[in-house]
Regions:
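Long, contiguous binding/interaction regions
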Residues: 1-245
Length: 245
């Protein structure tokens, strides 16, 4: 049984696709798989801007072999893909599994491959890098929102006003957030009280951005990061509609 989540975020200055098996959030601490194994693959040509078709095929074969042949000795927990680098992450009980992984990698000389391992008793790569925080989780919702706007005929590249609704446990927390909003590049909006909600103290803030996914992700991440220390959360996005002609 798996529970894969895919989201887009930035990695080393590039747009990246992250995949993480969410089931291991609870399972990793009770397993004895504390040896991280990671396999990085890139085009042989260091100046290449992307994987060519042959390299894409060879990487798929590499991925399938690693997952199939390491089964029972290692668990595949996630991956990060950019145009020029693809990395697979595993956890194993024994560091010796790296030898088996390295042997598999040697069969794929058409790719530039690095195969390495590290002891991670606290599963840092999974919890701090692969598993999404609130800002990264929001990127999934952002992608859905952007697609809905695209289907309606909106010009996604045009900058427009975007209004965010954030919710807090108390009026005091909301006030503290709104006090610092201008420093974040947002304009404070209205406030409301939703008594039936677990976070009843609500407010809106607005700013300007396009609806490209990287831009909207950075926009919402600023608000989420500022609200998080006050136990606030982003609950709604409302972007002005700009028609595509």
């Amino acid at each position: 049984m798996t529970d894969w989540l895919t989201y887009e975020w930035e990695f080393r200055g590039e747009r990246a696709t992250f995949r993480v098996d969410m089931q291991y959030w609870e399972l990793l601490p009770v397993l004895s798989y504390s040896q991280l194994i990671y396999v990085c693959a890139a085009p042989k040509d260091s100046l290449a801007k992307e994987f060519n078709k042959v390299e894409q095929y060879r990487f798929r074969m590499l991925r399938h072999r690693l997952i199939d042949e390491l089964e029972g000795r290692a668990i595949h927990v996630g991956s990060v893909y950019t145009d020029t680098l693809r990395t697979l992450y595993f956890y194993a009980a024994e560091a010796e599994v790296i030898q088996q992984a390295s042997a598999i990698c040697r069969d794929f000389g058409t790719l530039a491959i690095t195969c390495a391992h590290a002891s991670e008793p606290h599963f840092t790569t999974y919890y701090r890098f692969l598993y999404p925080d609130d800002a990264r989780l929001q990127s999934v919702e952002n992608a859905v929102y952007i697609e809905a706007m695209r289907k309606k005929g909106s010009d996604l590249e045009m900058i427009r006003r975007v209004t965010l609704t954030l919710s807090f446990l108390t009026v005091e927390d909301r006030s503290a957030f709104l006090k610092d909003v201008p420093k974040l590049g947002f304009t404070p909006g209205g406030t409301s009280w939703q008594g039936e909600s677990t976070h009843p103290a609500c407010c809106t803030v607005s700013g300007f951005t396009s609806l490209s996914l990287p831009k909207l992700n950075k926009f919402t991440a600023r608000a989420i990061s500022a609200a998080a220390p006050l136990e606030g959360m982003l609950t709604d996005i409302d972007a002005e509609f700009v028609r595509r002609y």
